Curated annotation (Swiss-Prot):
It holds the Pfam family PRA-CH. The lineage of its organism: Bacteria, Pseudomonadati, Bacteroidota, Bacteroidia, Bacteroidales. Keywords: Amino-acid biosynthesis, ATP-binding, Cytoplasm, Histidine biosynthesis, Hydrolase, Multifunctional enzyme, Nucleotide-binding. Its main location: cytoplasm. This is Histidine biosynthesis bifunctional protein HisIE. It is found in: Cytoplasm.
Length: 203
């Protein structure tokens, strides 16, 4: 990666994004030395313009930013770093430097899909998910049907708390069903996205 450090007197902006939630956590600046150290250690290191030295995020608090990926923009003068934060990012104690909560619950579905994929690949004994895969597609489909019925019952005659509980079970078993057929939850998301594009006229 050939970065252009000349435009800002030896610095490039580095946008830090949570690898899971995709929330923007903070913005810092790197010189070449800070960038090289970040790549070498796997922990985000900036150049402090006030202290005039390198500083690794978390060197005092322990709230390191563990690098997952580093990308340059089209002009090679700005970085997007996806990282796993070890704790609150801002020195004020908030999750982000904009005072936002670092959470995006819907993104957990991808993490859940990855977990179920791993179960399908490794098939560890004693795992409930393994037992589902071992039972075969018909049993998995039956389980999805049962969870769907339970969700409907809670929606019509149950409590809101139980509706959420049973709905979560339904989604979990649906992901298992998709995985057993070679698909992922993202495939459903793509289908919904296509349906709601500007060219989709049925809704």
């Amino acid at each position: 990666m050939e970065l252009d450090f000349d435009k800002m007197n030896g610095l490039v902006p580095a946008i830090i994004q949570d690898n899971e939630t995709r929330k923007v956590l903070m913005l810092g600046f790197m010189n070449k030395e800070a960038y090289d150290k970040t790549v070498e250690t796997g922990k985000v290191t900036f150049f402090s313009r006030t202290k005039n030295r390198l500083w690794t995020k978390g060197e005092e608090s322990g709230n390191f930013l563990h690098v997952v990926s580093i990308k340059a923009d089209c002009d090679n003068d700005t970085l997007l770093i996806q990282a796993d934060p070890a704790g609150p990012v801002c020195h004020t104690g908030t999750d982000t430097c904009w005072g936002e909560k670092n959470e995006e619950p819907v993104m957990f579905l991808k993490a859940l899909q990855d977990f179920i994929d791993k179960r399908h690949e490794e098939m560890p004994q004693g795992s409930y998910t393994t037992s589902l895969f071992e039972s075969g597609i018909n049993k998995i489909a039956q389980k999805v049907g049962e969870e769907a019925v339970e969700t409907v019952i809670e929606a019509t005659n149950g409590t809101n708390e139980r509706l959420i509980y049973e709905g979560a079970d339904l989604i979990y078993h649906m992901i298992v069903l998709l995985t057993s057929k070679g698909y992922r939850i993202e495939d459903l998301a793509r289908e919904l996205q296509e349906r709601h594009s500007s060219t989709w006229k049925k809704h």
